[in-house]
């Protein structure tokens, strides 16, 4: 059957209406036209009446004119997959945007796929060690699970994601896919160059045969129209699914999943849907479910996904972050009040949760230490009002000791990052799980009550804290 062609009848920002004679293209099909010499891809979103489809443009529509010819490709948007994508930057429609020539792909795959069936899914529970103390102890990540990083603007979500890529890619050596959804282009550019410098990826312009690229980058950043931002997460996921189906354990990073929802909401109004709570699209839960249900572990391989989730105005009850919560195995909440104390990563130890923190998965000792740490911090939180009104002197001896230990625990949760070496000047630390448990266990049992608080700030293992304590004592003397 020859490719169907139609004509543009109306352009409203990112939404384009196309009229076809006879057979209408299916919903989610991709249509193509030329705009200023460039290929413009439109995705069918609605059928209007007998002969018109309403589509969402994947690029800017400036310069489109009514009557212009549009061709139906007969399938959804298809993107290159396989090892040829590693080390490359591609956009939502699979075109390379790193000026390093065409992508050597092993074939094309449609970005809209069915989620794996129940029978295909794997149910094993295994922990993914990240080398970040506060995460591994209190909200451990599941291998093949979904992890959400919640936080307002500027509390360190992107830095934490970069550290995870660095630690986990180096520790387990698998492939990663990074989807930049509606975030700053500058950060995407920095990430690309950091990957080349840290040898996670080879430089496509200047290949070094000793470096094998481990991460594919897919970007649809803030300057892109909403169509691209609403679909780029699916493009990244399609590449990750292909690696998984070939038996790989893949890491899939999305920065930022809120922008995926935001783009959907921008398009929704243009498509004429009546908005729901807080102006979001009525299909919010469906859109989120369609993406999240595909991120799963099958009998063949696993996808472990880490998603940064921007929280508008620090309000966790906003429909966008609240809808994401339902899908996650672990949540890491970054708190502004902790960042203000200078404690980085600014992970809130009482607000971060994980399905994996169970004695059956992590073992009795780990579970007991994690609960003791949370107990000490919870008690400290309860005493803060009394301290603010009456001061430390009014507390009982037992409470004074609890406060002192809690402050040390808080500081011991900070840790120098490899990716932050550039601006902190201190070398990054990867802390093994056994060392993390040992350190916090000693702290809550009172083994280190004699050391000053400052000894625990920005160190890796407890041995480093003891060394730092000795140094501080020598300097004070």
UniProtKB/Swiss-Prot annotation:
It catalyses: ATP + H2O + 4 H(+)(in) = ADP + phosphate + 5 H(+)(out). Pfam families: ATP-synt_ab, ATP-synt_ab_N, ATP-synt_VA_C. SUPFAM superfamilies: C-terminal domain of alpha and beta subunits of F1 ATP synthase, N-terminal domain of alpha and beta subunits of F1 ATP synthase, P-loop containing nucleoside triphosphate hydrolases. GO terms for molecular function: ATP binding; ATP hydrolysis activity; proton-transporting ATP synthase activity, rotational mechanism. Produces ATP from ADP in the presence of a proton gradient across the membrane. The catalytic sites are hosted primarily by the beta subunits. F-type ATPases have 2 components, CF(1) - the catalytic core - and CF(0) - the membrane proton channel. CF(1) has five subunits: alpha(3), beta(3), gamma(1), delta(1), epsilon(1). CF(0) has three main subunits: a(1), b(2) and c(9-12). The alpha and beta chains form an alternating ring which encloses part of the gamma chain. CF(1) is attached to CF(0) by a central stalk formed by the gamma and epsilon chains, while a peripheral stalk is formed by the delta and b chains. This is ATP synthase subunit beta.
């Amino acid at each position: 059957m020859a490719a169907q062609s139609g004509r543009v009848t109306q352009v409203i920002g990112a939404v384009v209406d196309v009229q076809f004679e006879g057979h209408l293209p299916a919903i989610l099909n991709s249509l193509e036209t030329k705009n200023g010499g460039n290929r413009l891809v439109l995705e069918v979103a609605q059928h209007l009446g007998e002969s018109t489809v309403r589509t969402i443009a994947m690029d800017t529509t400036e310069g489109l004119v009514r009557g212009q010819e549009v061709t139906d490709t007969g399938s959804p948007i298809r993107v290159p997959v396989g090892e040829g994508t590693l080390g490359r930057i591609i956009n939502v429609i699979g075109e390379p945007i790193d000026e390093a020539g065409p992508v050597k792909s092993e074939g094309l795959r449609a970005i809209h796929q069915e989620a794996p069936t129940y029978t295909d899914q794997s149910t094993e529970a295994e922990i993914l060690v990240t080398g970040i103390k506060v995460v591994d102890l209190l909200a451990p990540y599941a291998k093949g699970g979904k992890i959400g990083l919640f936080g307002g603007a500027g509390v360190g979500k992107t830095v934490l994601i970069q550290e995870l890529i660095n630690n986990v890619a180096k520790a387990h050596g698998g492939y990663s896919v990074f989807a930049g959804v509606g975030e700053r282009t500058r950060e995407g550019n920095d990430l690309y160059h950091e990957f080349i410098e840290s040898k996670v990826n080879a430089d496509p312009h200047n290949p070094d045969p000793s470096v094998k690229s481990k991460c594919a980058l897919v970007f649809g950043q803030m300057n892109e129209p909403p169509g691209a931002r609403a679909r780029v997460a699916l493009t990244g996921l399609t590449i990750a699914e292909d690696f998984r189906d070939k038996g790989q354990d893949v890491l899939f990073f999305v920065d930022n999943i809120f922008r995926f929802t935001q783009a959907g909401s921008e398009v929704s109004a243009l498509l004429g849907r009546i908005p729901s709570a807080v102006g979001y699209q009525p299909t919010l839960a469906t859109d989120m479910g369609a993406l999240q249900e595909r991120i799963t572990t099958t009998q063949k391989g696993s996808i472990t996904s880490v998603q940064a989730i921007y929280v508008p105005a620090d309000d966790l009850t906003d429909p966008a972050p609240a809808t994401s919560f339902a899908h996650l195995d672990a949540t890491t909440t970054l708190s502004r009040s902790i960042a203000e104390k200078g404690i980085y990563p600014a992970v809130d130890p009482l607000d971060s949760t994980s399905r994996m923190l169970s004695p059956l998965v992590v073992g009795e000792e780990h579970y007991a230490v994690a609960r003791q740490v949370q107990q000490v911090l919870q008690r400290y939180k309860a005493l803060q009002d009394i301290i603010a009104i009456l001061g430390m002197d009014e507390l009982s001896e037992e409470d004074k000791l609890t406060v002192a230990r809690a402050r040390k625990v808080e500081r011991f949760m900070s840790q120098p990052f490899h990716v932050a070496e550039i601006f902190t000047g201190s070398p990054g630390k990867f802390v093994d799980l056994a060392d993390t448990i040992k350190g916090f266990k000693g702290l809550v049992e009172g083994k280190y009550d004699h050391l000053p608080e400052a000894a625990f700030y920005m160190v890796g293992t407890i041995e480093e804290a003891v060394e730092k304590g000795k140094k501080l004592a020598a300097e004070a003397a």
